[in-house]
């Protein structure tokens, strides 16, 4: 009788565990959020010869590291993340042949956690060729063990046919690793070249109930002055602070040397806004922090013209964002006295633009980075402990910016 009782108890326990497992699996399958939201993104651009690897990407494997913001599936803690990757060939004039792509948790240098590696497919196939000027999304991957604020490695094996000039992002602030031939996740990655750029990767999205914040900016947002491979841009600190409170995607669409209206490096903000900002799925908030280069590059004596052009451009971008249902956070332009392009004309323009940002009421919220980072004793300069070149911030300054921006975003949910 005692043995029968023990048997029945064990059978009941097994059935209960089996039922719980079925419920969990069913939950992962049936209750997974249907909304795609960005956890990482970058602004793609044309690659000049000086930013291409010395070795051709043809018949190589390229391992690139990115830091995500949120993990997705936040309400389903026992479920892996469902994700997809966008690859871009938008700024190239020839197709790019890709033999395979896999994603894995990143370790130090080019090493990965091999057991976490998952191959991506494109319409059911591992190989894909992206036409000149085009983008492709991978099929959704439902089994990746993604953690919020973690570093993941995206490994791309190229075929023989690649463009002379790849579509890239120059200011990755992380090292990418190139190996000869096709290298799988279990194989040793024998690096033949290292570059601090990203090639062909554009967006990583997860299924999530959360939304994302898109940040439009120049080199200060792109992380010039941060530490390579340390993830200490101001948007990294922003993502960390926000995700301590609740899941949210933080998408850095900054480009070094970028202008709002015209000139500078890569497409100006007015031209790239629809793709880089409005093209982000379920990005409900915009941080607009650009204008330094428009002012710095304008000829002496033209401060009034650049002020008028910048304000007109801000109005256009804010109106577009509002029409798309986005809340707009507009940031003041930070000081740059001590940098080579400073003159009283440029400072007058900066002050006029910042006055309009603070008083116009056009944006929903003002992020007063100028007031935060300026030297109280010399308000047309950055605080000495916040900058090493009097234009860009350093990690200390970026941390202050990220924490401050997070406080405003959390107070205006």
Regions found by a protein language model. Give the residues of each.
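Bacterial Sec-dependent N-terminal signal peptides
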Residues: 1-30
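Surface-exposed amphipathic alpha-helices with a cationic face
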Residues: 314-322
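N-terminal secretory targeting modules
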Residues: 20-216, 226-228
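Conserved SGNH/GDSL esterase-like catalytic core that processes O-acyl groups on lipids
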Residues: 40, 104-110, 180-204, 209-315, ...
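Surface-exposed acidic, glycine-flexible loop patches that form ligand/cofactor-binding
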Residues: 144-145, 275-282, 319-320, 411-413
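Catalytic His-Asp segment of secreted/periplasmic serine-dependent ester chemistry enzymes
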Residues: 296, 333-413
């Amino acid at each position: 009788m005692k043995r029968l009782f023990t048997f029945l108890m064990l059978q009941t326990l097994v059935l209960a565990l089996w039922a719980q497992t079925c419920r969990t699996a069913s939950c992962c399958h049936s209750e997974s959020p249907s909304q795609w939201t960005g956890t990482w993104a970058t602004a793609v651009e044309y690659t000049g010869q000086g930013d291409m690897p010395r070795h051709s990407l043809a018949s190589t494997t390229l391992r690139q590291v990115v830091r995500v913001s949120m993990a997705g599936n936040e309400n389903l803690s026992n479920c892996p993340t469902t994700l997809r990757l966008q690859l871009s060939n938008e700024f190239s004039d020839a197709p790019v042949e890709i033999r395979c792509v896999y994603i894995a948790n990143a370790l130090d240098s080019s090493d990965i956690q091999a057991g976490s590696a998952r191959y991506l497919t494109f319409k059911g196939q591992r190989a894909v060729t992206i036409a000149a000027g085009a983008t492709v999304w991978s099929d959704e991957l439902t089994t990746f063990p993604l953690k919020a604020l973690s570093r993941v490695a995206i490994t791309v094996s190229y075929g023989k046919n690649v463009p002379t000039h790849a579509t890239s992002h120059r200011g990755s602030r992380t090292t990418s690793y190139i190996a000869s031939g096709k290298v799988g996740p279990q194989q040793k990655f024998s690096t033949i070249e290292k570059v601090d750029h990203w090639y062909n990767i554009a967006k990583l999205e997860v299924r999530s109930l959360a939304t994302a914040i898109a940040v439009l900016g120049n080199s200060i947002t792109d992380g010039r002055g941060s530490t390579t491979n340390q993830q200490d841009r101001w948007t990294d600190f922003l993502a960390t602070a926000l995700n301590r409170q609740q899941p949210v995607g933080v998408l850095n669409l900054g480009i070094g040397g970028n202008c709002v209206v015209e000139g500078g490096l890569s497409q100006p903000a007015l031209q790239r806004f629809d793709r880089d900002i409005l093209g982000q799925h379920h990005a409900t908030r915009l941080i607009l922090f650009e204008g330094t280069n428009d002012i710095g590059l304008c000829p002496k004596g033209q401060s009034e013209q650049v002020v008028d052009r910048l304000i007109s451009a801000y109005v256009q971008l804010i109106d577009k964002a509002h029409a798309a249902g986005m809340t707009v956070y507009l940031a003041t332009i930070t000081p740059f006295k001590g940098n080579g392009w400073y003159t009283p004309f440029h400072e007058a323009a900066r002050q006029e633009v910042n006055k309009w940002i603070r008083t116009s009421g056009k944006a929903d919220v003002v992020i007063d980075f100028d007031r935060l980072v300026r030297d109280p004793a010399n308000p047309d300069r950055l605080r000495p402990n916040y900058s090493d070149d009097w234009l860009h911030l350093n990690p200390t300054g970026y941390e202050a910016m990220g924490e401050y921006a997070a406080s405003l975003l959390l107070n205006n949910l």
